Design a protein with these regions (language model features):
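Short, glycine- and charge-enriched coil/turn segments that flank and shape catalytic ligand pockets
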Residues: 59, 79-85, 129-132
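Extended, compositionally biased flexible segments
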Residues: 1-74, 195, 209-212
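Catalytic-pocket segment enriched in acidic/His residues
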Residues: 2-8, 24, 30-32, 100-216
Length: 216
C-alpha cells in the first residue's frame, strides 16, 4: 500500500483515459474507440479528500466522472501488458471533474474543460488489489448512487490501457493513470456532496473519496 497526502504525491503526469466504458461513450453520443483515447490532466487541479470542488463562473454544466486510478511504481516505455501490470504500485479513486459545456464548445477536446483548479479530486492512499476483475467504481451524490461500473466491463483491460499509453509517452514512477468513467455522469451543483468509491463486487467499500461542491 502506498500512503501519502496529496501534497506528497507530486505526480509528474496525470493521464486519463476516455470512453473505456461503452455505455458512457454512448451517453455522450460517441462511438466506442478501437484504440484507447487518453489526455493529460494538470497536477495543479489536484485536491484531496474533504477539499471543495469549485464550480467556475465560466461553466454552467460541471459534471462528476468517478474513476479508478493507479499509481505507477516503475517506469514504462513501449511496455507489454504484463510489464504494465507489474508497474502498478496501487489503486485508488479519482473524480475527473469536467465542464461539459466547455468540452462541447471545444469540439470534444479535453484541455479547457478538465483542468480548472480543484477538477481532479484524488484519494492519496493507494491500496493493493489482488484481482482487478473483482472491483468496481461507484459515484454517490448526496447519498444517491449515480454511477457504477465494474472494471471487468471496460472496453480495454487496465494492462492494455497502460501499455498503449507507454507506446506514445514514457510513464514514470509516481505518475497517476485514471482508467475512465462508467455511464451516469451528471451535473454537480453548489452544496452537493460527491463520493467516489472503490468497491469489491460484493459492495464492500475499499476506498472512499468525498468532496463538497461550492461555487467560485
Amino acid at each position: 500500500m502506498i500512503q501519502s497526502s496529496i501534497r506528497d504525491l507530486n505526480p509528474g503526469k496525470i493521464v486519463c483515459l476516455a470512453r473505456t466504458f461503452a455505455k458512457h461513450a454512448a451517453e455522450l453520443g460517441n462511438e466506442v474507440p478501437t484504440d484507447p483515447i487518453f489526455f493529460l490532466k494538470a497536477p495543479s487541479a489536484l485536491i484531496g479528500p474533504g477539499d471543495a470542488i469549485i464550480l467556475p463562473e465560466q461553466s454552467a454544466l460541471v459534471q462528476h466522472e468517478g474513476e479508478i486510478a493507479v499509481r505507477l511504481s516503475a517506469s514504462l516505455t513501449r511496455a507489454s501488458e504484463a510489464q504494465a501490470y507489474n508497474a502498478i504500485g496501487g489503486w485508488s479513486v479519482l473524480n475527473d471533474v469536467t465542464a461539459r459545456d466547455l468540452q462541447r464548445a471545444d469540439a470534444g477536446r479535453f484541455t479547457r474543460a478538465k483542468n480548472f483548479d480543484s477538477f481532479c479530486p484524488l484519494h492519496p492512499e493507494f491500496i493493493d488489489i489482488a484481482d482487478w476483475r473483482q472491483v468496481a467504481v461507484r459515484t454517490v451524490v448526496n447519498g444517491v448512487q449515480r454511477q457504477y461500473g465494474a472494471l471487468s466491463t471496460m472496453v480495454f483491460t487496465p494492462g492494455r490501457l497502460l501499455a498503449y499509453v507507454s507506446h506514445f509517452m514514457t510513464l514514470e514512477a509516481g505518475d497517476i493513470v485514471s482508467l475512465g468513467t462508467p455511464h451516469g455522469v451528471d451535473k454537480l451543483s453548489d452544496g452537493d456532496l460527491v463520493g467516489i468509491e472503490l468497491v469489491n463486487l460484493e459492495g464492500h467499500c475499499l476506498r472512499r473519496l468525498e468532496n463538497p461542491v461550492r461555487v467560485a
